């Protein structure tokens, strides 16, 4: 096997600038809220990525640090951006104290690449590297997470976003001036501690956008008149009614792909269920500082928005 691509690590919880594609087919990059997009290496026409599963420390709010598990130095891990039809190869190195896998949530791919440990692939032991390889078949917003000791590993923050851009102009995917993406995640961290309770299923006390809590969440910035797209994935254990102030949006995409325009309608709140992705779009035509948050009050206070 050729030498692995060097893993690119990230130490900051700030929102990184969008990654302009240095090679391969062009696309309009997204901005991952309080996150970043990982670079790739081109190898004989294949986009190669290297994810490292490892313990990390995430600054959830200024001065509030939490022991998590993630990828490439952060939780959530880096966003992966590709173009429809790209052949991709992802090297996954395990630096955790237990076995892991990665499931490419929502993707169409060969069964042996689906990442369910003990079903269609062996678990990746500590210190070992597994290689996933498949074609990005359809455009959309997807997620990745372990299917190995899920209760522990997802409670510790192991998750990330995957975005497949359309290869050509798509009749259901409009051009936008602002394109944001983030994951909903939740943790149970007792006062005076730094490590989440991994067996918690209901009583979470830290509700976050991309593992950041208000007021540490970066703003979604737009100029008046911009068309804005926001992609929201939910890997918590409960639904989240995501609500915008001062504007109406349309839900334009789901995990299954773009929604026909005849099936869209304006609203100000959309429920994002467990394991779902929702893509909303709106015109930023009202100037001001507007709230965007989960409308479950204890989540808003927790502080998810």
Say what each PLM segment does:
Residues 1-305:
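Copper-binding active sites and cupredoxin-like electron-transfer domains
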